[in-house]
C-alpha cells in the first residue's frame, strides 16, 4: 500500500510503501480489545485496602444481652452492619497485571496500525526530522501542519530522539513514542497519528518477522 510522504512544512514530497502484512490486514477487534485491557490492567497499582471486622479497632464485647431488650441481636460493634464496623468483601491489595500471549499482542498491533492507516486524514507520514533547538514552539509549528491540538496526537519515531521528546514535553495531549515502545491504547485513541519515515520502515521490518 502506497502512502504520501510530506515534508515537515506540510508539502508532498514523495511516497512510501506500507507493508500490507502490517498496515493492511483484516482487523481483529477482539485482539485490540484484549491488548488495551491488558495494558490498562498492568498500569493499575492495586493498593486499595479495607479493614475486615477482625482488623477494625474496637471491642469484641457483646453490646447487650441476646434476649429481653427488644433490640436486634448483635455480637460485636465491629459488625459490618454498624457504622464504624468492618467492611464485608472489600478490596485488598492485589496485582492486576497479567501476560498476554505474544501472538495476540502482535495481531493487536498490526490490527490497530491497519485501522489507523485506513484513514488518510488522521494518519500522516512525514520526512525524518529533528528539533535541534529542543524548543516546544519549533515542534508545535511542525505539528500544526498535520494536526490540530483539540485531541490526542501521537508521533512515532524510528529512533529514540531525545531532542524531539524534550520539545514535546510541554505540549498537552501529545505523546512521542519510539516504534519499539508502542502501546495499542495510545494508537487506538489518538485523534491524529504522525509517523516519521524511519518509524514506518522499522515497523515494516519489526512486525513481519
Curated annotation (Swiss-Prot):
GO terms for molecular function: rRNA binding; structural constituent of ribosome. Gene3D superfamilies: 3.40.1370.10. Part of the 50S ribosomal subunit. GO terms for biological process: translation. The keyword rRNA-binding applies. One of the primary rRNA binding proteins, this protein initially binds near the 5'-end of the 23S rRNA. It is important during the early stages of 50S assembly. It makes multiple contacts with different domains of the 23S rRNA in the assembled 50S subunit and ribosome. Forms part of the polypeptide exit tunnel. Residues 59-72 have a biased composition (Basic residues). One of its GO terms (cellular component) is ribonucleoprotein complex. This is Large ribosomal subunit protein uL4. Keywords: Ribonucleoprotein, Ribosomal protein, RNA-binding, rRNA-binding. It holds the Pfam family Ribosomal_L4. PANTHER family: 50S RIBOSOMAL PROTEIN L4, LARGE RIBOSOMAL SUBUNIT PROTEIN UL4M. Belongs to the universal ribosomal protein uL4 family. Residues 47-72 are annotated as: Disordered.
Amino acid at each position: 500500500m502506497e502512502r504520501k510522504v510530506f515534508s515537515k512544512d506540510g508539502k508532498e514530497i514523495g511516497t512510501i510503501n506500507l507493508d500490507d502484512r502490517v498496515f493492511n490486514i483484516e482487523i481483529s477487534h477482539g485482539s485490540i480489545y484484549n491488548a488495551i485491557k491488558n495494558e490498562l490492567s498492568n498500569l493499575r497499582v492495586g493498593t486499595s485496602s479495607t479493614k475486615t471486622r477482625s482488623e477494625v479497632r474496637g471491642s469484641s464485647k457483646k453490646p447487650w444481652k441476646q434476649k429481653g431488650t427488644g433490640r436486634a441481636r448483635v455480637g460485636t460493634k465491629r459488625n459490618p452492619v454498624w457504622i464504624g464496623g468492618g467492611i464485608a468483601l472489600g478490596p485488598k491489595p492485589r496485582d492486576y497485571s497479567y501476560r498476554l500471549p505474544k501472538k495476540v499482542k502482535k495481531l493487536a498491533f498490526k490490527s490497530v496500525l491497519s485501522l489507523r492507516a485506513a484513514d488518510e486524514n488522521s494518519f500522516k507520514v512525514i520526512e525524518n526530522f529533528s528539533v535541534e533547538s529542543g524548543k516546544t514552539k519549533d515542534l508545535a509549528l511542525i505539528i500544526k501542519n498535520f494536526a490540530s491540538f483539540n485531541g490526542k496526537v501521537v508521533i512515532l519515531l524510528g529512533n529514540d530522539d531525545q531532542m524531539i521528546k524534550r520539545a514535546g514535553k510541554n505540549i498537552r495531549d501529545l505523546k512521542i513514542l519510539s516504534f519499539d515502545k508502542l502501546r495499542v491504547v495510545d494508537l487506538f485513541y489518538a485523534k491524529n497519528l504522525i509517523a516519521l519515515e524511519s518509524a514506518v520502515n522499522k515497523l515494516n521490518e519489526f512486525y513481519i518477522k
